[in-house]
Each structure stands twice: as structure tokens, then as C-alpha cells.
Amino acid sequence: MAKQKVPAAPSVRRLPSYLHLVKKAEADKLEYISGTVIAEELELEPIQVRKDLTITGIVGKPKKGYPVKLLITAIEKFLGWNKEKKAFVIGAGSLGTALSGYQGFKEHGLDICAAFDSDKRKIGKEIHELPVFGMDELETKVKEYKPEIAILTVPSKYAQEAANAIVKAGIKAIWNFTNIKITVPDKVIVQKEDLSSGYAMLGVMMNTKK
């Protein structure tokens, strides 16, 4: 069976910004919002906005734009934010702790229910009211909590070892915040976040302002 084509990453990454604006329009009691308005707010070209929104399956109405409520539903469904997904944080260090406490995830249906670490000083304690378990408990806790996602925040030198444990435990999606490209079976999905890329863009924009 052929693999389903994944939409272009830039288009997908812009959808949350669109969703934020459309929800604001809903709060302002607007029934429709145009691609032009979205484009102006985000400093994009209207044709780009329309192209991005087509991947959600919604079509705008001439001279009116997009129905606000339907657009919210379409974007959330496309992103998978209309259904709750449970997640484990693997690595209870500074980054893992920060992500565990980010309340915005819950707005998008991501429920972080536990953290894991190999440091005995952290095991048995809590971070942001989440229990911290030892890595040797991962398989047992996967059966108990049934998470779909592992958020990987361990030090880079332990990334592959932790990824192996995640795969063995049966989790099929890894959000990788380490700077290591981990190796996993084809059946496991990996999304790598490169925080340095965002910093690089910030640096370039600052240089152009000088």
C-alpha cells in the first residue's frame, strides 16, 4: 500500500496561527472571515493562505470568505486536535519540566500524564503535579495510561537509548526535542524539533533591522 502523502510542512506549521485568528473572530461574533484578513494579520499573501487552507478540505464562499465555525472545525480535525491524545515526557530535566507545565497543550487535546527519568533523585517526585517514574517502569505505565506520544527531552547522548525504550514499550509517535536524529522502525512516527532553527531565523531578522 502506498504511503499517504504528507502536506508540506510550512503549510501545516501556519495552520495554528490561522486557527488562533479564526477563534478570535468567533469570539468577536463574526460569522465569516476572509483569507485576505488572515493574510494581512499574519503578513502573508492571500493566495498563500487560501492554498494552505485547501489542505483542510474547506472551501471559502465568494465575497464572504470562510464560515468561522466550520473553519475552526476543519483546522482542528486536520491537525488532530479534535481528539485527546495522551503523552509521556521522557526526560524530566529543564526542558522536560517546562514542557510538562505548558498549559497550551491541553487546549489542543494533548494530555501529558506522566514523566520519566533515570535520575533516582527525581523518581517518585512530581513536576507540575505529574508523577515522575523510572525508565524501567515505562512498559508497565504504557499499558496503564495508554499514551500515543512520547515527548523526548533527554540529553542527546541518551536519545537513541531512550528512543529504543519508547519503541519497545509500544509508543508509536515520538516528538523529538534532542539534537540527535534517532533511528526507529518504519511504523514509528518521529517529529524532530530543532530549536536552533527558530533562533537562527531570529538572528537573521535582527541583522536585517540593523
Curated annotation (Swiss-Prot):
Transferase among keywords: no
InterPro entries linked: CoA-bd (IPR003781), NAD(P)-bd_dom_sf (IPR036291), Rex_DNA-bd_C_dom (IPR009718), Tscrpt_rep_Rex (IPR022876), WH-like_DNA-bd_sf (IPR036388), WH_DNA-bd_sf (IPR036390)
A GO cellular-component term linked to this record: cytoplasm
Molecular function, one GO term: DNA-binding transcription factor activity
Bilayer-crossing regions: none
Chain positions recorded as NAD(+) binding sites: 91-96
One annotated GO biological process: response to redox state
Chain segments annotated as coiled-coil in the UniProt record: none
Compartments it resides in: Cytoplasm
Pfam families per the UniProt record, alphabetical: CoA_binding, Put_DNA-bind_N
DNA-binding region: 17-56
Predominant subcellular localization, coarse grouping: cytoplasm
Sorted UniProt keywords: Cytoplasm, DNA-binding, NAD, Repressor, Transcription, Transcription regulation
Subunit organization: Homodimer.
UniProt similarity note: Belongs to the transcriptional regulatory Rex family.
Function: Modulates transcription in response to changes in cellular NADH/NAD(+) redox state.
PANTHER family per UniProt: REDOX-SENSING TRANSCRIPTIONAL REPRESSOR REX, REDOX-SENSING TRANSCRIPTIONAL REPRESSOR REX 1
NCBIfam families the record matches: PRK05472.2-3 (NF003994), PRK05472.2-4 (NF003995), PRK05472.2-5 (NF003996)
Protein name: Redox-sensing transcriptional repressor Rex
Name of encoding gene: rex
